[in-house]
Swiss-Prot record:
One function term, GO molecular function aspect: RNA polymerase II cis-regulatory region sequence-specific DNA binding
Ranges of Gly residues composition bias in the record: 33-47
InterPro entries, sorted: bZIP, bZIP_sf, CREB1-like_pKID, Leuzip_CREB
Tissue: Most cells of the adult brain; cell bodies, but not neuropil.
Effect of residue 328 to V: Fails to block PKA-dependent activation by isoform E; in isoform G
Sequence ranges assigned to domain KID in this UniProt record: 198-257
Family: Belongs to the bZIP family. ATF subfamily.
Region feature Basic motif, mapped onto this chain: 301-326
Record-given protein name: Cyclic AMP response element-binding protein B
Length: 359
């Protein structure tokens, strides 16, 4: 298994030199029989008590620290520290099986919630083990000894050289065992900002597929297609009967070339369209443009004549209407005069009748 661990919390742990992530690799306690530890790749080693006295100690060798004898017991430990990492959290449970693991990093509370072994053996969950970190950064915190169940789980994981995950909610500690019987502990200090989970790189989100379109979008798309003008209808109206015969050979030639190209593949279809005879295609296009311009001029001229006739007819209609109104007005005036004359004549006749009757 790869020893490197990548944890994403919004900022990459390998992008900055002042990370809150520390790596502690404690080699097997059996190396103490040889009488000393081998040298690491940096200058941040030393006794844990010496590390506590220097709160700003950093390693110059990158991810690998110095190696020395710690606690006077001949146990070899490899320490890797970064800035402001000087607190030791020894896990006594692993020390009983020949391994000493120390977790270095700032913090005020640490809780080991569960230990699980992933392998051919069944999964074993242990009880919570709590440890309190002193407020003083130089304080040393000792974790309470684990139960017999925890020891069995850790011993089984060490013997099988499998992965043991120690879940710590505040610090997210993960322990890996390597083929060399070394334990790598990566202590992650919780960030002060909310974590973001990146999506899987293999996950595909099709955006242009037909399935991703909703019913409203599909209906709107179909309505737009139905509202689009029919270019074939416009072409037939403009071209007329003479152009229909001329346009058919060109469309047949393009259709035949497309069918031939489709049998050979999509690229062949595109190449066949591009390999058409330019003289054949351009000749039809030129004739189409010439006839189209003549037909357009003819239609424009006919439209102008029709509009002129309509204007003249409307003008004549308005003139006749005015004349008719004038005739009606004159006739009304004549009839009024005649009515007055008849009324006067009637009066005179009545007077004459009255006079003759009296006589």
């Amino acid at each position: 298994m790869d020893n490197s661990i990548v944890e994403e919390n919004g900022n990459s742990s390998a992008a900055s030199g002042s990370n809150d992530v520390v790596d502690v690799v404690a080699q097997q306690a059996a190396a103490a029989v040889g009488g000393g530890g081998g040298g690491g790749g940096g200058g941040g080693g030393g006794n844990p008590q010496q590390q506590q006295q220097n709160p700003q100690s950093t390693t110059a060798g990158g991810p690998t620290g110095a190696t020395n004898n710690a606690q006077g017991g001949g146990v070899s430990s490899v320490l890797t520290t970064t800035a402001n990492c000087n607190i030791q959290y020894p896990i006594q449970t692993l020390a009983q099986h020949g391994l000493q693991v120390s977790i270095w990093g700032p913090g005020a509370w640490c809780q080991l919630s569960s230990v699980r072994c992933y392998g051919s053996q069944p999964e074993v969950a242990t009880k919570d083990v709590q440890s309190v970190i002193q407020a003083n950064p130089s304080g040393v915190i000792q974790t309470a000894a684990g139960t017999q169940q925890q020891q069995q789980a850790l011993a089984a994981a060490t013997a099988m050289q499998k992965v043991v995950y120690v879940a710590k909610p505040p610090n997210s500690t993960v322990i890996h065992t390597t083929p060399g019987n070394a334990v790598q502990v990566r202590n992650k200090i919780p960030p002060t900002f909310p974590c973001k989970i990146k999506p899987e790189p293999n996950t595909q989100h099709p955006e242009d597929s037909d399935e991703s379109l909703s019913d409203d979008d599909s209906q709107h798309h179909r309505s737009e297609l139905t509202r689009r003008p029919s270019y074939n209808k416009i072409f037939t109206e403009i071209s007329g009967p003479d152009m229909s015969g001329a346009s058919l050979p060109m469309s047949d030639g393009v259709l035949n070339s497309q069918l031939a190209g489709t049998g050979a593949g999509g690229n062949a279809a595109n190449s066949s369209l591009m390999q058409l005879d330019p003289t054949y295609y351009l000749s039809n296009r030129m004739s189409y443009n010439t006839n189209n311009s003549g037909i357009a001029e003819d239609q424009t001229r006919k439209r102008e004549i029709r509009l002129q006739k309509n204007r003249e007819a409307a003008r004549e209609c308005r003139r006749k209407k005015k004349e008719y109104i004038k005739c009606l007005e004159n006739r009304v005036a004549v009839l009024e005069n005649q009515n007055k004359a008849l009324i006067e004549e009637l009066k005179s006749l009545k007077e004459l009748y009255c006079q003759t009757k009296n006589d």
